[in-house]
Amino acid sequence: MGNVSVAVGTAVGIPIAVGVIIALIFWCKLQRRYKKEEIRDADLEKMVMEEVAVSVYDGFKAEINSSSEASTINEKEANQDLKPCQEKTAKAGYTPAYRRQLNASMGTLRPKKQSTAYTNVPVIFSGEKVNYGMVRDPSYSFMYPLTLSRKETSSLRSASTSNLSSSTENTALHEEIKLDDPYENDFTNYTVNKREFIDSLRPH
């Protein structure tokens, strides 16, 4: 009996033990394979995440570059639009140096308008006579010239046709003498020319 039980136990136990051992071997191999696959999957996932991050960064960078390029283009267009206006204002407001000098020289050469109102009315002091058609200014030492006022053509014609005496003509001429512009005293021969003109009007 003992031998039979040993034989049955060995006949049954040995195959079972072998099967268990084989199963353990396959299980260990599968576990190693699973670990390798997990490591590989982790590496693949890491690579995918890196690629996604790089692509997202590249897209964001491209968007920033496009926006900056658009802003620079808009600024350039705005500057180009403003340049003609600035050039027009500069051309309108700028005056060359030779033009300014020419305007200044023309201003100096242009005669000033003489005022018809006298600041100091020339008078004749008592006891002082008219000296060759000159009258003294009370505030200054120089003399103002006296000149004839414009005659009417009718008075000239009547004076030329009438045969009055020299004393009557002199009286009429002295009554028509009035004070002329004080700035004409620069012409020293003004009175002489006036007297020659008066003498030429007298009938011979």
UniProtKB/Swiss-Prot annotation:
What does a knockout show?
Increases frequency of mitochondrial genome loss.
Q: What cellular component GO annotations does this protein have?
A: cytoplasm; fungal-type vacuole; nucleus; vacuolar membrane
UniProt keywords (A-Z) are: Cell cycle, Membrane, Transmembrane, Transmembrane helix, Vacuole
Membrane topology classification: Single-pass membrane protein
Bilayer-crossing residues are 6-26
Source organism superkingdom: Eukaryota
Which compartments does it reside in?
A: Vacuole membrane
Q: What is its main location?
A: membrane
Question: In UniProt terms, what function does this protein have?
Answer: Involved in cell cycle progression and surviving DNA damage.
Similarity comment text for this entry:
Belongs to the SKG1 family.
How is this protein named in the record?
Altered inheritance of mitochondria protein 20
